[in-house]
Amino acid sequence: MLKLSDITLSVCALTVSACSSPAPSPLLPGRYESPLVLMQRLQGEVGHLHIDEVRYRASDANLFQCSYTFGVIDARDPSSMRYLAENLRHTIPGDRRRPGCIHLAWDGDVVYTTHRGNLSNPTFISGWDISTKDPEDRRRMKPTQLPVLQEAGESYEGIDVENGFVYVALKDRGLGIYRRNAKTNVLSRVGSIGGLGSTWGVRVRNQTVFVTALEGSLLTVDVADAAHPKLLGKATTGGVARGLAVDGAMAYVAAGSEGLVVVDASDLTNPKVVGKSPTRGTAVRVDYSQGHAFVAAWNDARVYDVSRPASPRFIGAVRLTTDVMYPDHGRAAATGRTLGIAANGNDVFIGNWWVPYSYRLHADRTAPSLVLPEEINLTDFGPVARGETHTIDVDVRNQGTTPLTLFSNWTTSNAFTVAPEQLKLAAGESGKLQLTYRATTGEAEKGVLNIWSDDPLQPVRTGFLVGNHGGLGVGQPLPETRVALLDGSQWTSSQVQKKVTLLAYFATF
């Protein structure tokens, strides 16, 4: 009697390929809807604003922004925002550049602005009276600038207003308290407190001021007596603490590399860190609305469910990009830096490097979210001899709330390969793509890496690949370079011969 196993063995002997392990099924993309949906990209007179702060006022649905300029936006319909006033620049004594601002706060029709100062601009407190309509267009405002306050030795950062008092972070000088003369609009200092560290962010609730310090702390200050403020307590947040938002007894701090930090300040004399959540980039500013914390984190804007303060839960993120006119064909759009954020319920307002955006939050949705390193925009394999290879590992991560499928990874040039061609990552999981360059000539070679995934916000990501690239590049010698320094001396690259050299870009804003 012939057994079934004998038949199977005979068939396999005749057709070996038919009995080999079946090929794995190809990975197919899932179908997801993003928790954050774009409503509007607001293009005004200027398309490169470098927005620092945006703040939303619920009483009239105005959105205020500080950037290269100051502006007021009608945000009653977040999908159809419009400028009420824009491109306003401050006239500052002794400064011909007419700067914008970095921080803002309001007191009715008076909106205060501050600038910390830099190599090109002096520091100041000023602002705008927005009570007047434009006679040529009654739908728009015609703001008038407030008098400028400049105090010897001071530098001004975050600002907030409560009960007619204006509270300003003075960096290494602590916190300053001011009052405005209603007739002249001139600010005068009424009190101050030092010894707080390098202060940056300010929010006031009743008679308590919450202040962040760049050393990584949140401080509480009693201002019941404005002339004699008193330090109440301090919580160590870690990182570089900048922006903050306060709701009831809870404070939310954007703490740089520490990400989002949640502080319980129910005991003002002993505030305590109760929760943290990492951010992809440097957390700069934060807002709070209806159980959610919204974080401007340099590389993206992020939303967390903070209904359980000890365990902030990531909901979603938005990475905004802009096209840059690179000379190379195939370069990916660059990440547009995000420094400002504001929220009203499910309406999210993002202050991007270029222009403001509005998004609608759908907190009930789950979706994958692909994170790639910024250097993917220019992956330089350095000099490689003809016929030789060089492999670079690229970290990929799914920061989303459901599995991420990279269902098609490929390159446009035979000189470059990527493996694996498909990859699946669970929520929160990281993996690697191996990029290999095989030099086919001694000349420069270029290609584009394509990553197709089921991330609903960025289903197609690309990277620019170069090998044997001309000019300054990874692994290539630095040509003789001379630099005139600000102190009048000179620096030459020969001074750092055979040493690793960091080339840094610096600009003043």
Region roles according to the model:
Residues S17-A18:
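C-terminal motif of bacterial Sec signal peptides marking the signal peptidase cleavage site
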Residues P22-R365:
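Feature marking well-ordered beta-strand scaffolds used for ligand recognition
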Residues D364-Q399, R438, G442, H469, ...:
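Beta-sheet-dominated interaction scaffolds and their linkers
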Residues A367-N377, Q399-Q434:
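Surface-exposed binding patches on compact interaction domains or structured appendages
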Residues H390, T401-L406, A444-E445, W491:
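Short acidic/proline- and small/hydrophobic-mixed sequence motifs that coincide with surface turns
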Residues G442-G470:
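Terminal connector regions
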Residues V466-S494:
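N-terminal "domain-start" segment that seeds a small globular fold
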Residues S493-F509:
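Short active-site neighborhood of thiol/selenol oxidoreductases, capturing the structured segment around
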